[in-house]
Regions:
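Conserved SET/PR-domain catalytic core that frames the SAM/AdoMet-binding pocket
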Residues: 128-141
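Non-catalytic, conserved peripheral segments adjacent to functional cores
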Residues: 2-128, 145-181
Length: 181
């Protein structure tokens, strides 16, 4: 079997293969919506100033957000670092990539969801900052895809409960976990 694609010499169209679907608009923004119900993406923009760079991370008047922040964490992932698959039952995560390149893998584990068992992958970071809203019940994991540390901010709508954590983890190698990370 050859990896070479034959071209029709009259039309320059390949005889085999699948056309890529649109992923970005002509303005450089994502052209696709999240594939999981309740997951939302807010495109953020770096603003160059005479003294450097400004990035708005969160505003309570953004129409796609609608929460009162109760806790904010900054996370620095080591080069190649990977988190466990995890989900929350009460907490909504609001993740903003601020440095590096981070791959966010999502898997809908909500039995009553219209998108149950659907997966999605969203990339974000310093070059392409986005706010990604992950609702309760959606399994998610993150991978630093770069060779340098990568950082993200997580804005919670529920404070972390030290005595009764709303964090449910899957052990590495758990059968049935999607291979998308």
């Amino acid at each position: 079997m050859s990896d070479v694609v034959a071209l029709d010499t009259k039309t320059s169209k390949p005889d085999v293969g699948v056309r890529d679907s649109q992923t970005v608009s002509s303005g450089g923004r994502l052209a696709v919506s999240p594939r999981i119900a309740g997951v939302r993406i807010v495109e953020l923009g770096n603003v160059l100033t005479r003294s450097g760079l400004l990035l708005e991370l969160f505003r309570d008047d953004w129409p796609d957000v609608g929460i009162k922040p109760r806790q904010v964490n900054w996370v620095c992932m080591n080069a190649g670092g990977v988190t466990d698959w995890h989900r929350h039952t009460r907490q909504t995560d609001h993740l903003v990539g601020v440095s590096g390149v981070i791959k966010l893998a999502l898997w809908d584990g909500r039995p009553s969801s219209s998108t149950v068992n659907r997966t999605d992958v969203i990339r974000f970071g310093g070059v392409s900052p986005r706010l990604v809203i992950v609702p309760p019940g959606v399994w998610h994991a993150l991978r630093n895809e770069g060779g340098e540390p990568a950082g993200y901010i997580n804005v919670f709508d529920e404070p972390y409960d030290y005595a009764n954590p709303d964090n449910w983890r899957l052990q590495p190698g758990t059968v049935g976990v999607p291979d998308i990370l």
